[in-house]
Regions:
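Beta1/beta-strand and adjacent pyrophosphate-binding region of the FAD-binding site
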Residues: 17-31
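Core beta-strand elements of the Rossmann-like FAD/NAD(P) dinucleotide-binding domain
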Residues: 19-21, 212-221
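Glycine-rich FAD pyrophosphate-binding loop
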Residues: 40-61
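Dinucleotide-binding Rossmann-like beta1-alpha1 core, especially the glycine-rich loop
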Residues: 64-148
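Helix-loop-beta segment of a Rossmann-like dinucleotide-binding subdomain
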Residues: 107, 147-184, 205, 290-299, ...
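C-terminal catalytic lobe of FAD-dependent flavoproteins
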Residues: 170-172, 180, 238-252, 259-261, ...
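A conserved short coil-to-beta-strand element within the FAD-binding core of flavoproteins
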Residues: 190-204
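Flavin (primarily FAD) binding-site architecture
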Residues: 224-239
Length: 406
């Protein structure tokens, strides 16, 4: 897994000393940098504070998919899927070097709980929500085509469906969005620890530590985009916001030594019917993910032995002759609304609580998907507009090209 960094080029270290910003963003994951870009493109002055490195947390430890979320249709999250498919189409257009369309294969066996009729219905709705574009079409493979599917177990194979979604390098995408934000005037302090924020009716006072130096600034609004640290950041804000009832859900991925030729695989875990992906990752492949509640320090999350065993059991079930040599593994944390139900069945809708709906000075991003970062950022800026000065928009993030940072 590529490590994150705050200093890809010398320009990343250039910081204009400014005492006041329209928006201060806390957190340098994909949602934080997305807000920085959206705000800067809307003409606002922005400061982003990141405690360690860009994409150091969840934004470098995801499944690295830009997708509509086919399985969310089972929970009737049609709005979320439609938005995600819209965002997928936008990212394929504005970031072709970062986001690439890939074929996905869904195998069906007698023990598969999602039967062919159900899959056809779901994929049909998926195609409709995607606008019936080329990247939204699906088909059932002929029996002869299944022999070329990277050693997929042929015995009792009843059907294989092919559809399309997209893949990215999440850390690279995060860096590209931040670079775009900087080009439109956003400022980055990294590493910089957020210390406190005093939220008042007329604005905010923010303190942070950069190296050994404590600094402060004022802003019209503060955005808490700290991901798994969202409540930790909230505890440093005055007046103290209500603690957000969330669960941290650990997801582990394995990087395997053997690559894939045909594409990506969407498999149903025989143990619990959860969705598991086997994805090409350079010359290797990536297998994931798990979902287990996590209660420790977010920075200390690490793959568990039982998670490795669980994933390799899935691999063995579908690909009995593939190598199971693990050359790397990583774990990340998703932020989900607290609930008694299994993490797999919970909504992925992003929540944007504010301190004052009439004149918001503080907004938190709770949850969120990699695919929807741009749409979420647009909602954040729209929500905060009534608390911000009038500015002239400079660019539209829906059409602004994104390039890899070299």
């Amino acid at each position: 897994m590529k490590s994150a960094s705050c200093s890809l080029t010398p320009t990343w270290r250039i910081c204009v000393l400014t005492d006041h910003f329209d928006i201060v963003v806390v957190g340098g994951g994909i949602h934080g940098v997305g807000v920085a870009q959206a705000a800067a493109c809307a003409g606002y002055s922005v400061l982003l504070l990141e405690q360690s490195a860009l994409a150091a947390g969840t934004s470098s430890r995801s499944s690295k998919l830009i997708h509509g979320g086919l399985r969310y249709l089972e929970g009737f999250d049609v709005g979320l899927v439609h938005e995600s498919l819209t965002e997928r189409a936008i990212l394929l257009k504005i970031a072709p070097e970062l986001v690439r369309l890939k074929p996905f294969f869904i195998p069906v066996y007698p023990e598969t709980s999602r039967r062919p009729l159900t899959l056809r219905a779901g994929l049909s709705l998926y195609a409709i929500l995607g606008g019936l574009k080329r990247e939204s079409r699906f088909r059932e493979l002929a029996r002869s085509e299944c022999r070329a599917l990277d050693g997929l177990r042929p015995d009792n194979l009843q059907a294989v469906f092919q559809y399309y979604d997209a893949q990215t390098n999440d850390a690279d995408l995060t860096h590209a969005v931040m670079h775009s934000a900087i080009e439109f005037g956003a400022e980055l302090r990294c590493p910089a620890e957020f210390l406190s924020a005093d939220i008042g009716a007329s604005g905010c006072e923010v303190s942070y530590r950069e190296g050994v130096t404590d600094r402060s600034c004022t802003s019209s609004a503060v955005v808490n985009a700290a991901g798994p640290w969202v409540n930790t950041v909230s505890e440093r804000i005055s007046p103290l916001p209500a603690r957000m009832p969330v669960d941290l859900v650990q997801g582990t991925h394995l990087v395997l030594d053997e690559g894939l030729d045909a594409g990506c695989y969407y498999m149903e875990a025989p143990q619990d019917q959860r969705a598991i992906f086997l994805l090409p990752w350079g010359k290797q492949s990536m297998l994931g993910t798990t979902e287990n509640l996590y209660s420790g320090e977010p920075a200390a999350v690490t793959p568990l032995a039982q998670e490795v065993d669980y994933l390799l059991e899935v691999l063995q079930h579908y690909f009995p002759h593939r190598s199971q040599q693990v050359i790397d593994s990583f774990a990340g944390l998703r932020v989900l609304p607290a609930a008694d139900s299994a993490a797999f069945k919970r909504t992925r809708e992003t929540q944007l609580p504010v301190d004052n709906p009439r004149l918001p000075r503080l907004l938190a991003i709770v949850g969120g998907k990699l695919t929807g970062y741009r749409a979420t950022a647009a909602k954040v800026v729209h929500t905060l507009r009534r608390s911000l000065p009038d500015r002239r928009s400079r660019a539209d993030t829906a059409t602004l090209p994104l390039k890899p940072v070299t």
